[in-house]
C-alpha cells in the first residue's frame, strides 16, 4: 500500500505545535496540541484533557495546520480517525512520546495511567486528500474566531510602572 501522506502535510504538521480540527456538529474548528509520529498525528482528549467533542465517534475530520513562521493557515487535510487501544503495541510506542509533549500535566508521572482509564488517544491518519494548500486557498473569509470562554478578562489594563508623567523638578 502506498503512503498517501503529502510531504507538505507531514512537514507542516510535524513542525506545528497546534492543529485545528473541524469536528462534527461544531460551528468552528477547535485547536489541539498533538504529536506527529510514524505518518500520523496523535491527540489526547477526554477527562481533564483538551475538549474535542465528537472526535472519538468521528470517522474523518479536516485538519488545518498553521505556518510556524507567519502563523497563517498553511495546509488543510482530511484525516481518518481511529482510537489507539490501551495496552496495544501502538499505545506503548506513542503514549510515552505524548506524555513528553504534554505541558503542565497535573499528575505528571501517572498521566499515562489516567489516559488509559479516562481519556482517548486518537490517531489522525492522512487520507491523501488535501483541501487547502498554498496557492489553492478559498477566496472567502475563513478566519477562525476564538471559542467563547469564561477565562477572558475585560477591563482596564494594569498599571504600568513609569507610565505616568512626573512633575518637573524645580
Question: Locations of the language-model features?
Answer:
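Charged, gly/pro-rich active-site loop segments
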Residues: 72-170
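Short amphipathic alpha-helical surface micro-motifs
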Residues: 1-4, 44-46, 56-65, 101-107, ...
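Short beta-alpha junction loops
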Residues: 67-69
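Short, conserved active-site entrance elements at the starts or edges of catalytic domains
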Residues: 1-28, 151, 160, 168-170
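A generic local structural motif
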Residues: 5-8, 28-30, 48-50, 108-110
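General structural signal for secondary-structure boundaries
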Residues: 1-8, 31, 85-87, 100-104
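Short secondary-structure boundary/capping segments
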Residues: 10, 33, 112-114
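Short beta-strand segments
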Residues: 15-48, 53-55, 61-65, 74-77
